[in-house]
UniProtKB/Swiss-Prot annotation:
It catalyses: L-seryl-[protein] + ATP = O-phospho-L-seryl-[protein] + ADP + H(+); L-threonyl-[protein] + ATP = O-phospho-L-threonyl-[protein] + ADP + H(+); L-tyrosyl-[protein] + ATP = O-phospho-L-tyrosyl-[protein] + ADP + H(+). This is Salt tolerance receptor-like cytoplasmic kinase 1. It comes from Oryza sativa subsp. japonica. The active site is at residue 195. PROSITE patterns: PROTEIN_KINASE_DOM, PROTEIN_KINASE_ST. PANTHER family: OS01G0253100 PROTEIN (PTHR27001), SALT TOLERANCE RECEPTOR-LIKE CYTOPLASMIC KINASE 1 (PTHR27001:SF660).
C-alpha cells in the first residue's frame, strides 16, 4: 500500500489498457451494496473526507488526477501511482493497478469486507468507485507512513537517525493486536486478514497504528488456496507466512497469529522479517536465542538500552508462543491483547493505548 502522500486511492485495472484512453463508455459493473448508514448523496470527491465510505463517480477520480496526467510519484511491479489533489490543501495518491477479471472479483470482495469494518486501529475507508472495470478505494490520511519505514528506514529530514521509541513499539503492538482481536472475535463470521506485516501497519499523526490492506482477507473460519484467485492471496508475505499454512494450504485465525508473532519480533529486535543480505528469516535468526531466554541479546541495539527489560521479555515470550509450530497451541488474539495489557507498563503512558479498547464500534 502506498502511503507517501495524503489519502491513498487504489485503482485496480482489469485489462491492462491505458486508463487515460478510456471514456465514459467504460464497462459498467454491478455495484457493491454499502451499509445504508455509510452512503451519502454522490458529489464531488473534494468533500470525500467528510463522508463515510461514499460511493464516488468515475469523473471524480479523473478530476483529482487530471485525467491520469498528473505527476507519477511511484511505480510497482504491476502499478503506477499518480499524485492527486483532493482539495486545495489535501493531496492524495491514486494507484493504477494492472489486474485481471479474477483480481477485480478480489477487489469487490475486499470492498465488501472494508464496508463492514469500523475500528480505531483499522484504516478507515472513506470512499470507493466501482462504476467500471477499475475499482477505486480511498482511505484515511496516514501522514507518518508505515511501520516498516519507521522501524527499518529510520531517517527523518536532515538525515538525523530517528529510532522508534520502546514505549511506542509496545503501544503499536497492542493496537495491532486489538485490531486483530476485533477481526477474529467481534466479526461474525470472523475476518482473517491474511497478510499481517510491518508495511501493512500505517501510522497516523499521533503515531497510532492503523491496520491496512485487506486485499487478501478471508471471511469465515478458514480459507483454502483453491478458493482464491492466486496463491499469494493466501500465502501472505515472505518471512511472515505460517509454515502450517504452507503445508496445508489452509488459512485460519492462527495464521494471522503467526504473522503477528513475527511482527512482535520485528518490534523487539528492530530487524526485518527476512534479512536483505542473507535471506535468513528473523524467526530462524533469533528463535534459538529466545528459546534459551537470551532476550537482552536480541533487543534492538539502536534503543541504547532505553527499554524495559521485563516488557521485552513479555513481548519475546508472546512472539515465541505466536510462532509455535502447532496452530492449536498458539494463543488467540484475545489472549495476546490480555497479556500485553496486563504485563506491559509502557501502555499506561503511550498515546491511545488502554482507552482504545473502549473505542470499538
Amino acid at each position: 500500500m502506498f502511503t507517501g502522500c495524503g489519502l491513498f486511492a487504489c485503482v485496480r485495472r482489469c485489462d491492462g489498457g491505458d486508463v487515460r484512453k478510456r471514456g465514459e463508455a467504460g464497462a459498467m459493473s454491478s455495484r457493491v451494496a454499502a451499509d445504508p448508514a455509510g452512503v451519502e448523496e454522490e458529489g464531488s470527491c473534494k468533500n470525500v473526507a467528510a463522508a463515510s465510505a461514499r460511493q464516488l463517480a468515475w469523473a471524480d477520480v479523473e478530476s483529482v488526477t487530471g485525467g491520469f496526467s498528473s505527476r507519477v510519484i511511484g511505480h510497482g511491479g504491476f502499478s503506477t501511482v499518480y499524485l492527486a489533489s483532493l482539495s486545495s490543501s489535501r493531496l492524495g495518491a491514486v494507484k493504477v493497478h494492472c489486474s485481471s477479471e479474477r483480481l477485480h472479483r478480489a477487489f469487490r470482495q475486499e470492498l465488501e469486507v472494508l464496508l463492514s469494518l469500523r475500528h480505531p486501529h483499522i484504516v478507515r475507508l472513506l470512499g470507493y468507485c466501482d462504476e467500471r472495470d477499475e475499482g477505486v478505494l480511498v482511505f484515511e490520511y496516514a501522514p507518518n507512513g508505515d511501520l516498516h519505514e519507521r522501524l527499518h528506514c529510520s531517517e527523518v529530514a536532515g538525515g538525523v537517525a530517528s529510532v522508534l521509541p520502546w514505549a511506542r513499539r509496545v503501544a503499536i503492538a497492542f493496537q495491532v493486536a486489538m485490531a486483530l482481536e476485533y477481526l477474529h472475535e467481534s466479526r461474525h463470521p470472523a475476518v482473517i486478514h491474511g497478510d499481517i506485516k510491518a508495511s501493512n501497519v500505517l501510522l497516523d499523526a499521533n503515531m497510532n497504528a492503523k491496520l491496512c490492506d485487506f486485499g487478501f482477507a478471508h471471511v469465515g473460519f478458514s480459507a483454502t488456496v483453491g478458493c482464491r484467485p492466486s496463491a499469494r492471496a493466501v500465502m501472505g508475505s515472505p518471512g511472515y507466512v505460517d509454515p502450517h499454512l504452507i503445508r496445508s494450504g489452509v488459512a485460519t485465525k492462527k495464521s494471522d497469529v503467526y504473522s503477528f508473532g513475527v511482527l512482535l519480533l520485528e518490534l523487539v529486535t528492530g530487524k526485518e522479517a527476512v534479512c536483505r543480505d542473507t535471506g535468513r528469516r528473523l524467526t530462524a535468526a533469533v528463535g534459538p536465542m529466545l528459546s534459551e531466554g537470551k532476550v537482552a541479546d536480541v533487543v534492538d541495539r539502536r534503543l541504547g538500552g532505553e527499554h524495559d527489560g521485563a516488557e521485552a521479555a513479555v513481548m519475546a515470550e508472546l512472539a515465541m508462543q505466536c510462532i509455535g509450530d502447532s496452530p492449536g497451541l498458539r494463543p488467540s488474539m484475545a489472549d495476546v491483547v490480555r497479556a500485553l495489557q496486563e504485563k506491559t507498563s509502557a501502555l499506561a503512558s503511550a498515546v491511545g493505548s488502554r482507552l482504545d479498547r473502549k473505542m470499538m464500534f
